Amino acid sequence: LQLQQLQEQNESNRTMLECWTVLSSLVPLTRRIKLGAILVNLFRNPAIVAKMASTLDNISNGRLEFGLSAGWYQKEAEAYGAPFPSGSARVEMLKESVMILRKMLYSDNNNVNNKSNISFKGKYYNISNAECNPKAVQKPHNPRMALHFTPR
């Protein structure tokens, strides 16, 4: 087994555990497999996702891979109280999220205390002096991020 990957979207009635919690529980039980998550961008603030990704990448010694989906399953978004804007707006939200994630996970803007504080002002997301320290273990641009755009 090379990669254990979990997703958030569930359009069936099967049991599906929350992916970040499950992946965290696998860290001490495994040593080599990559740990992957496919996240719905609508469900979490990208600054929080960056902090979660950095944490999991650090405690797993660089084994995290994750993907982001613009979101396509309206019923699920509504069930969790998440917004479900038009397809083009979801894609724009995803683009802003990727900009924030890249800045927070990989930037080298270190201040006097060797910490990176990131600010971003966009149409959908605004963060001010958000910290993501320590940075992701993997270099140069990992954990790997895959994007998922949908036609809906």
Predicted regions: what they are:
Residues 1-152:
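Active-site-adjacent structural elements that line small-molecule/cofactor binding pockets in enzymes
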